Amino acid sequence: MDVGVFIPIGNNGWLISENAPQYMPTFELNKAIVQKAEGYGFDFALSMIKLRGFGGKTEFWEHNLESFTLMAGLAAVTSKIQLFATAATLTLPPAIVARMASTIDSISGGRFGVNLVTGWQKPEYSQMGLWPGDEFFGTRYQYLGEYAQVLRDLWATGRSDFKGEHFQMEDCRVSPKPQADMKIICAGSSDAGMAFSAQYADYNFCFGKGVNTPTAFAPAAERLQAACAKTGRHVTSCVLFMVIADETDEAARAKWEHYKAGADEEAIAWLGEQGAADKGADSNIRQMADPTSAVNINMGTLVGSYANVARMLDEIATVPGMQGVMLTFDDFLEGVEAFGQKIQPLMQSRRHVTALKESA
């Protein structure tokens, strides 16, 4: 099973809590995280894009780096780990993204890919006059399909004459082409999102569900496989989980309860308000805004001893259609270190990594 890290490009990572570590995003922090992850054999690192945060006492996600420029910098200071940047497709024409991606492909030696997002938080785009209207909620995957086709054309052939409803290319050119096959990621979970991933993506990200229920996301992976049966393409799932681990279950649970007790209710309320704006929202967005465990945006959470977290991660690997897991941590530097030293060596699904380290 592949393992990746969802790096903290926004302040405070993924915990909306006054009791969680409070920090600003910097290149140096993310460099330290990704270099440490690479040293422990992580397969990939991905950064999101966020253009406006949730406010509240913690000013959650009000402070963010930009994804492509961050990953370009990280490409220059890493050598093995795969890197993915996120394109907010309402802000960047596909031909520009194709050229930026080709540039980072050159910097990284073929270790780069792109995560495509349509945009669900209206204020991110309306603040700069780029929101196309609320009808976009219903047409965004048609838009994204055209966007992805232009990217595929340019990366494969260096030119595009695509003519669609949203994009019209006229002998559009990008050179040099990427040296490696450029992977596309999406995180759709609605029927339209799954259909898009089955047609255009290489991997589809989904949210884990619940606390210490590692395989509860399996229906999402099953739905993706059903969508792929219609397109004849092989697309696999990667699932997002937060790891809160310690020497004992009790110590890990105490940290989790402490974070929940300090939840930034004002920021969480903003998240719920924005998530409700799209009446036909992807279940990812509805899940993020659910008040049940909104302190970490309702991503799946693994709370326990290092041994029990390793066991639960191995359970994830048994789900059909799984490619890998993408992890966040309450404290990223400590979390990646603990994963590499105390969790990964106990995982059967990572024996190929630990065996290499043992023989080195």
Curated annotation (Swiss-Prot):
Reaction(s) the record says it catalyses: uracil + FMNH2 + NADH + O2 = (Z)-3-ureidoacrylate + FMN + NAD(+) + H2O + H(+); thymine + FMNH2 + NADH + O2 = (Z)-2-methylureidoacrylate + FMN + NAD(+) + H2O + H(+)
EC primary class: oxidoreductase
Protein's recorded name: Pyrimidine monooxygenase RutA
Enzyme Commission (EC) number: 1.14.99.46
Source taxon at top rank: Bacteria
Pfam family, one: Bac_luciferase
A Gene Ontology biological process term: uracil catabolic process
Function: The FMN-N(5)-oxide reacts spontaneously with NADH to produce FMN. Requires the flavin reductase RutF to regenerate FMN in vivo.
Binding annotation for FMN: 49-50, 115, 124, 140-141, 190
Entry's family note: Belongs to the NtaA/SnaA/DszA monooxygenase family. RutA subfamily.
UniProt-listed InterPro entries: Luciferase-like_dom (IPR011251), Luciferase-like_sf (IPR036661), Pyrimidine_monooxygenase_RutA (IPR019914), SsuD_RutA_monooxygenase (IPR050172)
Organism: Stutzerimonas stutzeri (strain A1501) (Pseudomonas stutzeri)
